[in-house]
Swiss-Prot record:
Record protein name field: WD repeat-containing protein 48 homolog
Region of interest called Disordered, as start-end residue ranges on this chain: 341-364
Gene (UniProt): wdr-48
InterPro entries noted in UniProt: G-protein_beta_WD-40_rep (IPR020472), WD40/YVTN_repeat-like_dom_sf (IPR015943), WD40_repeat_CS (IPR019775), WD40_repeat_dom_sf (IPR036322), WD40_rpt (IPR001680), WDR48 (IPR051246), WDR48/Bun107 (IPR021772)
Null mutant phenotype: Changed locomotion behavior with mutants displaying decreased reversal frequencies consistent with decreased glutamergic signaling.
Annotated signal sequence range: none
WD repeat segments: 27-82, 88-130, 133-167, 176-215, 218-257, 260-299, 302-343, 389-428
Positions with biased composition (Low complexity): 351-364
Keyword flag Lipoprotein: no
Tissue specificity remark: Expressed in several head neurons and cells in the tail including the anal depressor cell.
Described function: Together with wdr-20, binds to and stimulates the activity of the deubiquitinating enzyme usp-46, leading to deubiquitination and stabilization of the glr-1 glutamate receptor.
Assembly description: Interacts with usp-46; the interaction increases the catalytic activity of usp-46 in the presence of wdr-20.
Keyword terms of this UniProt record: Repeat, Ubl conjugation pathway, WD repeat
Pfam assignment, any one: WD40
Length: 683
């Protein structure tokens, strides 16, 4: 299945990307920032920085098991079963909501889109629609179940409302936020929408009139999470200022502040009675706090990494909590009441006044409750009741000097080598020192960069653009191919494009045999067939995705037709018309080496392709200069032995005959001016 928006081929410049990954990505990689639980069917939906939404069959609490050691891998004997993946996003998944009576999942992503999925149990494909109302990262979603409306908010300052029953038609654009929006909440009947973010204030809207109602101030840093009660009278907010604030919406003011956390609070969950809040964030602590008394915060447990998302498995009398963190593991923790924890007051429990305390709606000033050092408490739980293990994510990468291979180190400390042209991992080094392996694989060669690599998804993503993709010419020998022919020139970018579009009919039609190929056609003949599961993405110059498909699907009728409409013209020119840029010319000067004490050194200015080898320059010097110079005596020798009778230098560094001028200039000359070479006969 593919996702596409039609744009003219003559419009803004486009890029193409592909992801190097396993055929089946069963486990989350890196951070998990979005969770939804379908209690009726026992399904958990997870999403995060690896762009993939996964579905898991998980046991109910009565089937929960002792998690000593946790779950190590999905399998027949595991209580957790991987069910499938939803793969259309091209960047981090930030939020998800279940709607349509549990039949529809909506997801929001940094790829600027909101996507709609059919998640009925008998539907394996899922993708319904792609909503492109936003122009920047879509950070959060909210759901009004009574009226079947969904709400999205973005870094583009906009809040949109969609009618689920009308094919997700956009029915409102709530305008008024002046900065990026990080958090969103709505009442079940959509009578009120709250949005907040980097403005440090909370804005309230009435979607029925599209009007701004009020603005709530109090946070001193970004507001990262919002919750509102069903009747729209109270709201909770959490911020990077490490506070949780309770608001009386009627009075338009903060009536209580909780400062139990040490660092930013990023996620909140509240039970259905709006009496208890569960919070977590950067300090890794998961805390339970009764709303009637913010001094009664209890440390439930502490995670191994900052917490991105909390999700109660049920809102009525909750007994467990799903947790997603900056790590790839997902855990379910029991939050059943354990032994009574005494916090404040005397040892017999809270005082009568505290126990009966409720937040007053009077005109009294906001209350900041006494600080309780939650971090000094012993957590009520030490082991999760369920663990869905994640996979290691690539955390560091380096492009090698050959501009074909990328070395990586993952979150487990393992080092691996990837071949970009083949879109595959080709070697595992285990737990080695990264820099040492880079040095082992580095060569004394300069090749222009023709792609950009990033690993923010936990996997390698390779991006090619019009300016650089076809700039990398090199000899077949330098490219590492078996023929070792320095006369045959290859273009890495052209080869990569042929690999990516190999199955697309217009590309197939231009394939030729080596015997019949001209020099331009030979430049891409050695392309490598890629794994069919490789995702291919066409995007705008700013990275906004236009089309996503699998490399193996490019030959299918629907995908082929879409590619014909969306493929960038520079790609079509390269693979359909064999149009590649010409070799770059490089001017350089030749002078006798100062050690030869030339009487009147003549400075010859020449020009050649930047891939010309030093030994070719030596042949020129031998034939045109040394052989006619009465002051220098050289014997008559075969051209292929000239390097035994003379040497070439740049900045007093002796050059290897197999080096090309491009490498000499970038590794030895290192100046903006024209290259200067010295020659010296060997006696």
């Amino acid at each position: 299945m593919s996702s596409c928006v039609n744009t003219s081929q003559t419009g803004p410049k486009k890029k193409i990307s592909f992801i190097i990954r396993d055929e089946h990505e069963y486990s989350n990689r890196s951070a998990v920032s979005a969770l939804q639980y379908d209690a009726q069917n026992g399904r958990l939906f997870t999403g995060g920085s690896d762009t993939i939404i996964r579905t898991w069959s998980v046991p109910h609490h009565k089937d929960a098991f002792s998690a000593r050691g946790g779950v190590r891998s999905p399998g027949k004997n595991s209580p957790v079963q991987y069910q499938g993946s939803l793969e259309q996003h091209t960047d981090w998944v930030n939020d998800m909501i279940l709607c349509g009576h549990g039949k529809i999942l909506i997801s929001a992503s940094n790829d600027t889109t909101v996507k709609v999925w059919n998640i009925e149990r008998d539907n394996k494909h899922g993708f319904i629609d792609c909503i492109r109302t936003h122009k920047d990262y879509v950070s959060c979603l909210a759901y009004a179940p009574i009226v079947e409306k969904a709400v999205s908010a973005s870094f583009d300052h906009n809040i949109f409302v969609y009618d689920i029953n009308a094919n997700f038609k956009t029915v409102n654009n709530l305008i008024g936020c002046k900065d990026s929006i990080y958090s969103l909440a709505t009442t079940p009947n959509l009578s009120l929408v709250l949005g907040a973010g980097t403005e440090k204030c909370i804005r309230l809207f009435d979607p029925r009139t599209n009007e701004k109602i009020m603005k709530l101030r109090g946070h001193t840093d970004n507001v990262r999470a919002l919750v509102v009660n069903d009747d729209g009278t109270r709201a909770l907010s959490a911020g990077s200022d490490a506070t949780i604030r309770l608001w009386d919406i009627g009075q338009q003011r903060c009536i209580a502040t909780c400062i139990a956390h040490e660092e930013g609070v990023w996620t909140l969950q509240v039970d259905s009675s709006f009496t208890t809040v569960y919070s977590a964030g950067k300090d890794k602590m998961v805390v339970k706090t009764p709303l009637y008394d913010f001094t009664k915060s209890q440390l439930l447990f502490k995670e191994e990494a900052p917490v991105k998302k909390l999700l109660l498995s049920e809102k009525d009398n909750p007994v467990s909590l799903w947790v997603g963190t900056w790590k790839s593991d997902i855990k379910r923790w029991s939050i059943r009441p354990s032994a009574q924890l005494s916090i404040g007051g005397d040892e017999d429990g809270p005082s009568t006044s505290n126990a009966n305390h409720s937040v007053s709606a009077s005109s009294s000033p906001p209350v900041t409750f006494k600080y309780i050092r939650v971090k000094d408490q012993k957590g009520q739980q030490s082991t999760p009741e369920l663990v869905i293990p994640g996979a290691p994510a690539i955390k560091k990468h380096a492009m090698l000097s050959d501009k074909r291979h990328v070395l990586t180190r993952d979150s487990d400390g393992n080092v691996a080598l990837y071949d970009v042209l083949a879109a595959r991992k080709i070697k595992d080094y285990g737990k080695r020192i990264f820099e040492e392996v880079v040095d082992e694989n580095s060569r004394q060669v300069y090749i222009p960069s023709w792609f950009v690599v990033d690993s923010k998804s936990g996997m390698l993503q390779i991006t090619l653009d019009e300016l650089d993709a076809l700039s990398s010419w090199l000899s077949s020998k330098d490219a590492g191919f078996d023929d070792n022919d320095r006369e045959t020139k290859l273009n890495y970018g052209g080869m990569m494009l042929r690999s990516l579009f190999e199955r697309w009919p217009p590309c197939k039609m231009t394939n030729v045999d080596a015997a019949d190929a001209d020099d331009v056609q030979k430049a891409t003949l050695n392309f490598i067939s890629l794994p069919e599961h490789t995702p291919l993405i066409i995007c705008e110059g700013n990275g906004r995705p236009l089309y996503r498909l699998l490399v193996g699907d490019a030959g299918k009728e629907f995908e082929a037709n879409e590619l014909a409409q969306i493929a960038p013209m520079w790609v079509i020119d390269a693979i359909e018309r064999n149009q590649l840029p010409k070799f770059n010319k490089m001017p350089f000067y030749l002078l006798p080496h100062p050690s030869t004490n030339p009487k009147q050194p003549k400075k010859d200015r020449l020009s050649a392709t930047e891939m010309l080898q030093v030994k070719k320059v030596m042949e020129h010097v031998y034939e045109k200069i040394l052989s006619t110079n009465d002051d220098i005596t050289v014997g008559s020798i075969p051209l292929n032995q000239i390097h035994t009778k003379m040497e070439m230098y740049c900045n007093d560094q002796r050059l290897e005959p197999d080096m090309d001028l491009r490498t000499v200039k970038h590794l030895y000359w290192k100046q903006s001016g024209e290259l200067l070479l010295h020659y010296k006969p060997v006696k």
